[in-house]
UniProtKB/Swiss-Prot annotation:
The keyword Transit peptide applies. Belongs to the ribonuclease III family. Mitochondrion-specific ribosomal protein mL57 subfamily. Pfam families: Ribonucleas_3_3 (PF14622). It is found in: Mitochondrion. Its main location: mitochondrion. The lineage of its organism: Eukaryota, Fungi, Dikarya, Ascomycota, Taphrinomycotina. Component of the mitochondrial ribosome (mitoribosome), a dedicated translation machinery responsible for the synthesis of mitochondrial genome-encoded proteins, including at least some of the essential transmembrane subunits of the mitochondrial respiratory chain. The mitoribosomes are attached to the mitochondrial inner membrane and translation products are cotranslationally integrated into the membrane. One of its GO terms (biological process) is RNA processing. Component of the mitochondrial large ribosomal subunit (mt-LSU). Mature yeast 74S mitochondrial ribosomes consist of a small (37S) and a large (54S) subunit. The 37S small subunit contains a 15S ribosomal RNA (15S mt-rRNA) and at least 32 different proteins. The 54S large subunit contains a 21S rRNA (21S mt-rRNA) and at least 45 different proteins. mL57 forms a heterodimer with mL44 and stabilizes rRNA expansion segments 1/2 at a membrane-facing protuberance close to the point of attachment of the ribosome to the translocon in the membrane. Residues 1-59 form a transit peptide. This is Large ribosomal subunit protein mL57.
Length: 210
């Protein structure tokens, strides 16, 4: 089945490597392309001390999350080392789910059911841009590990950093959930994230009365 699929795409398999067969004079091994072919890229890396300092800023102590490899994974984006090092993406969906619950609780505690946001509102509240804004108070750039491709000799766009830093925030929530439990994760969210997400948020004119 894999062979048929490759043939449909104009690819051929030889000695377990995939080749593009359209021009055998310039055959290239897909997956073997040198990482430095695009000379325009922006790399961020950090030391163990940088990561420890970041976790100290977030939690008040670097060893709140005792596993060093987990600490490094949370600040590592999948683009770093071409995904060969453990990265934070597997934690993001769990972190986002916990943040959603905390946001909903925040509005339920008001006792005014007309203020309960729709799911679309919740997603807007924890958009990458807003989560990245939360991360700024911890100076994540000192610990982040990632590689951003560039179209030219310019700095990466702000939206690129938003995706990187928001994944760190969601990863932090998730790792607290897995290491310390749901109650601790909710407390961390409420104390360090929710107030920042909601303070300047303007809801669309959609009121949901149940």
């Amino acid at each position: 089945m894999l062979t048929r699929h490759c043939n449909r795409l104009g690819l051929q398999i030889e000695n377990k490597f995939v080749f593009r067969s359209s021009s055998w004079n310039c055959v290239r091994r897909i997956g073997k392309i040198a990482c430095n072919e695009n000379k325009y890229r922006y790399e961020m890396t950090s030391t163990e001390e940088d990561i420890d300092s970041f976790f100290s800023r977030v939690f008040g102590e670097k060893n709140y999350i005792s596993d060093k490899s987990l600490r490094e994974q949370i600040v590592t984006h999948k683009s770093y080392k071409h995904g060969l090092k453990r990265y934070n993406e597997p934690f993001v969906s769990v972190g986002n789910a916990v943040i959603d619950v905390c946001l909903l609780n925040h509005y339920l505690e008001s006792g005014n059911f007309s203020t309960i946001p729709s799911y679309k509102d919740l997603v807007n509240l924890r958009s990458p841009a807003r989560l990245a804004e939360v991360a700024k108070k911890w100076n994540p750039e000192t610990a982040t590990q990632c590689i951003l491709p560039l179209k030219g000799p310019n700095s990466p766009s702000s939206s690129s950093f938003e995706k990187i830093y928001s994944s760190i925030v969601s990863g932090l929530v998730a790792v607290v959930y897995f290491q310390k439990g749901g109650v601790e994760a909710m407390n961390f969210c409420k104390k360090s994230i929710i107030s920042d997400l909601t303070k300047d948020f303007v809801r669309p004119n959609t009121v949901h009365n149940q």
